[in-house]
Amino acid sequence: MERTVSGLQYEDTQPGQGETAKAGDQVSVHYTGWLQQNGIRGAKFDSSKDRGTPFSFGLGAGQVIRGWDEGVQGMRVGGTRVLVIPAALGYGARGAGGVIPPNATLQFEVELLAVAASGRP
């Protein structure tokens, strides 16, 4: 796995061949999220795949946790990336809704489905 200066770890498990996601783009993804403990994938807490509905957001716009804003940038459409997100780039000391405990490390598998560049519908 690659590690960024912020502490995010990522690995492209399936490189994409399409357009590259950049800050300011609107992106559509499928994802599954797990808690991670001691470097091991734990309990699944959310999955757009299970719901059958992709998730769309503005990349780099602060609409998602920082680990996603950083980790999805540079992906190419059709690609799948595993992100290991430290608490500081996730939900921090507050956790989230009783589902994600405080100071949790998160692991996501993210598949980039589409990119709409800023200024383009």
Per-range role (PLM):
Residues 1-121:
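Cross-family detector of peptidyl-prolyl cis-trans isomerase
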